[in-house]
A protein has these predicted regions:
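ATP-binding N-terminal substructure of ATP-dependent carboxylate-amine bond-forming enzymes
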Residues: 1-129, 141-149
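ATP-dependent carboxylate activation and anion-phosphoryl transfer catalytic cores
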Residues: 2-3, 8-26, 30, 50-52, ...
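Conserved beta3 strand of the protein kinase N-lobe
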Residues: 136-137
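Acidic/histidine-enriched active-site and ligand-binding environments that engage anionic O-linkages
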Residues: 149-159
Length: 454
């Protein structure tokens, strides 16, 4: 397979810019797509070419139109499409459309995506691969008598989860049978609106849980590497707030066990490209339970890049071109991948912590970001004069701090956040600063409920 000359990025905001930067460094031209409501988005201007999509479709529907993405790819002469995260990144129909039109999809095969992108079928894969899973139902039907019976068999408390997509959408904690029907219907509506598919299932809720995930890369020759783990336990309403690599509370034996579990699942389906295998860790007994596989690049991939030195997006591109993992990572084998230091990422958003984190909109009248040793910024519309609209998510920029130790990385992140000056819209910066100083966080005693219960 020949190297790509032009890559269309089927996304927007910071991840589109991140992908374009990776492609630029490799000498590849880039193509952006943008909805009318997103015409001032920086990703449009970062690309070598930009095309408007989705006339009359709406601000999000435009980015979800496979026909429009393929149309622009053909018009622009792009030979590959990178989906980023969110939007169409987990839709196997886009992969099929790429194959039908002679365009390479930078990501897993469609059959892999169908097996792993749906959380319910991913559970079956995990069970086949002899990886522990949390007790759960199959995909729920419409018979609420049957649902009530299944829920009672597993036992409360339960978590309703959407089969497709992520980001906390469609998820609902259910503490008892009186809440069951209302929460299931509520979660279905939210999942349908977010992903176009309302399917969901019930899962036993682990009370004191950590959220850890393993970064995987697989090539077309059948090789699988892991890039170690990330801790994503600090969440608010199932949305990640702080991500870390490596997880500071794991022993070397636990780290080895966890990473091998992640590798086993991906090896079982001959996984290609980048993926993340997510687990819950029970703090009381140290056991790991499979949650899902995200068949795409993650928002928090930056922390793994900082501690391994491997550019995950460039690796995705090279794997899609047919190159081996050793070529894509610069590492001859799994044993050559070493952890170096500690990194954490925080997400600066235009949410107002003083008003129940409601997203704020408007024009940024002043903007100054952090800089200095060990600080990395991945931003979208983060500049003075930029307009934050109500149509898209509230992420302003991602801040990643690296240092030799967790303590120094946290101190560096705190310093960086204090350097920010944002006027015109509210941000969550003060909230994150306080979080980083909390004794529970500093002592590594936090669970996934840390923020919600503090």
């Amino acid at each position: 397979m020949s190297d790509f000359k032009k890559i269309l990025v089927a996304n927007r905001g910071e991840i589109a810019i991140r992908i374009m930067r990776a492609a630029n460094e490799m000498g590849k031209a880039t193509v952006a797509v943008y909805a009318e409501e997103d015409k001032l988005g920086l990703h449009r201007f970062k690309a070598d070419e930009a095309y408007r999509i989705g006339e009359g479709m709406g601000p999000v529907a435009a980015y979800l139109s496979i026909d429009e993405i393929i149309r622009v790819a053909k018009e622009s002469g792009a030979d590959a499409i990178h989906p980023g995260y969110g939007l169409l990144s987990e839709n196997p129909d886009l992969v099929d459309a790429c194959v039908a039109n002679g365009i390479t999809f930078i990501g897993p095969r469609a059959e892999t995506m169908r097996a792993l992108g749906d959380k319910a079928s991913a559970r079956r894969v995990a069970i086949e691969a002899d990886v522990p899973v949390i007790p759960a139902t199959e995909v729920l039907g419409d018979d609420f008598d049957a649902i009530t019976k299944e829920a009672a068999e597993i036992g409360y408390p339960l978590m309703l989860k959407a089969s497709w997509g992520g980001g906390g959408r469609g998820m609902r904690p259910i503490n008892g049978p009186k809440e069951l029907k209302e929460k299931v219907l509520e979660g279905r509506r939210e999942a349908e609106a977010a992903f176009g598919n309302g399917e969901g299932y019930l899962e036993k809720m682990i009370i004191r849980a950590r959220h850890v995930e393993v970064q995987i890369l697989g090539d077309k020759q059948g090789n699988i590497y892991h890039l170690y783990e990330r801790d994503c336990s600090v969440q608010r309403r199932n949305q990640k707030v702080v991500e870390r690599a490596p997880a500071p509370y794991l022993s070397e034996a636990q780290r080895e066990e966890l990473c091998e579990l992640g590798r086993k699942i991906c090896a079982h389906v001959n996984y290609e490209c980048a993926g993340t295998v997510e687990f819950l860790m029970d703090m009381d007994d140290g056991k790991f339970y499979f949650i899902e596989v995200n068949p795409r690049v993650q928002v928090e991939h930056t922390v793994t890049e900082e501690v391994t030195g491997i550019d995950i997006v460039q690796a995705q591109i090279m794997i899609a071109e047919g190159k081996s993992l050793s070529e894509a990572t610069g590492k001859a084998s799994q044993y050559d991948i070493r952890l170096n230091g500690h990194a954490l990422q925080t997400r600066v958003t235009t949410e107002d912590p003083q008003n129940n984190f409601i997203p704020d909109y408007g024009r940024i009248t002043a903007y100054r970001s952090a800089t200095g040793m060990g600080i990395r910024l991945d931003g979208g519309t983060a500049y003075a004069g930029g307009v934050i609209t109500r149509y898209y998510d509230s992420l302003l920029t991602k801040v990643t701090a690296w240092a030799p130790t967790p303590e120094k990385a946290i101190a560096r992140m705190d310093r960086a956040l204090r350097e920010f000056r944002v006027r015109g819209v509210s941000t969550n910066i003060a909230f994150v600063e306080n979080l980083l100083k909390h004794p529970t966080f500093l002592n590594n005693q936090y669970t996934t409920k840390f923020i919600d219960e503090t």
